[in-house]
Structure formats: C-alpha cells, structure tokens
Amino acid sequence: KSAVTRNYSEKKNERLWFKKNYDHAGNQRRIQKWNTQLK
C-alpha cells in the first residue's frame, strides 16, 4: 500500500513539474513576443 501511495505521489509531482516547466516555457515565449513587439 505504501509503495503504491509513494508511486502515486511521485507521478503527481512529476506532472506538476512538467506543468510548471511547460508554463515557464510558455511565459518565456510570450515575453519574447512582447519584447519583439516593443522594439
């Protein structure tokens, strides 16, 4: 049971990590777009 719970929480953390990095990459692209529009 504890192994299953640990595995589940690891997967959850993995998803959160991917989401965070994906959002960060999206923010970087938006910032670059704004910068090029401002120039």
UniProtKB/Swiss-Prot annotation:
One of its GO terms (cellular component) is COP9 signalosome. It is found in: Cytoplasm; Nucleus. One of its GO terms (biological process) is red, far-red light phototransduction. Keywords: Cytoplasm, Developmental protein, Nucleus, Phytochrome signaling pathway, Signalosome. Belongs to the CSN2 family. Component of the COP9 signalosome complex (CSN), a complex involved in various cellular and developmental processes such as photomorphogenesis and auxin and jasmonate responses. The CSN complex is an essential regulator of the ubiquitin (Ubl) conjugation pathway by mediating the deneddylation of the cullin subunits of SCF-type E3 ligase complexes, leading to decrease the Ubl ligase activity of SCF. It is involved in repression of photomorphogenesis in darkness by regulating the activity of COP1-containing Ubl ligase complexes. Component of the CSN complex, probably composed of CSN1, CSN2, CSN3, CSN4, CSN5 (CSN5A or CSN5B), CSN6 (CSN6A or CSN6B), CSN7 and CSN8. This is COP9 signalosome complex subunit 2. It comes from Brassica oleracea. The gene is CSN2.
